[in-house]
């Protein structure tokens, strides 16, 4: 896929790979610098950025120990623009992880507000593990009690967007049935487009 030259900067989440286990020459041969922030637990979580433009600065994590141990946030500076690549926690495994997700969201919200004071031009992209509106999920009624579409999670995104963040996809595309994730257990899910839009590229209004 990278050989098709899809973009100058690519942000990936849930890489599940340790940096030392990756053959970096394959990316470098295609003209990409590659940066990885991995979870301490092998085969879990992690984020990576592939870029044809060398960043001015790289920030690993947010100084939140549990989040950083899970390799959830990688940040790169290009001039006066900062890109934040984030893999939000999922709460689907149980109540304990759902509670962790709420705590992570609150702390990350505070972190972003502080970061904007230093970097007015911010790009936040990643797997948020939250579908925002009913248009962003194939069965809103059937999933109203599902992690990823809970009222508290959607309210977090309401509050987030009320802080002058722009949902770049919805800025250009208002049509329904546009999703970014489909369950893998049954092929019919993707064939019938029963998906969720849980991946976002958001920018501050300064951009």
Label each PLM-derived region with a short phrase.
Residues 63-64, 88-105, 141-146:
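Surface-exposed cleft-lining segments at the edges of enzyme active sites
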Residues 14-18, 22-92:
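Structured beta-strand-rich core segments of catalytic domains in phosphoester-bond hydrolases
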Residues 2-11, 30-33, 106-198:
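Metal-dependent phosphoesterases centered on the DNase I-like endonuclease/exonuclease/phosphatase
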Residues 14, 172, 205:
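Short secondary-structure boundary segments
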Residues 18, 131-133, 203:
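General alpha-helical segment detector with a strong preference for membrane-spanning helices
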Residues 42-58, 176, 187-207:
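Conserved beta strand-loop-helix elements of the APE1-like EEP
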């Amino acid at each position: 896929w990278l050989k098709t030259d899809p973009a100058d900067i690519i942000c990936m989440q849930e890489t599940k790979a340790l940096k030392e286990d990756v053959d970096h020459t394959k990316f470098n041969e295609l003209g990409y610098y590659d940066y990885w922030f991995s979870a301490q637990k092998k085969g879990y979580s992690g984020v990576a950025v592939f870029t044809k433009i060398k960043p001015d600065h790289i920030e690993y994590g947010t100084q939140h120990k549990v989040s950083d141990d899970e390799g959830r946030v990688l940040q790169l500076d290009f001039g006066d623009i900062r890109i934040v690549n984030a893999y939000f926690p999922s709460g689907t495994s149980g109540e304990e992880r759902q509670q962790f997700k709420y705590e992570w969201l609150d702390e990350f919200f505070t972190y972003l507000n502080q970061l904007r004071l230093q970097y007015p031009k911010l790009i936040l992209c990643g797997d948020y593990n939250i579908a925002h509106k009913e248009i962003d999920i194939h069965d809103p009624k059937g999933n109203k009690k599902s992690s990823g579409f809970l009222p508290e999670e959607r309210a977090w995104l309401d509050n987030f967007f009320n802080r002058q963040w722009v949902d770049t996809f919805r800025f250009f595309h208002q049509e329904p049935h546009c999703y970014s994730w489909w369950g893998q257990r049954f092929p019919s899910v993707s064939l019938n487009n029963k998906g969720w839009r849980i991946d976002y590229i958001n920018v501050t209004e300064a951009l």
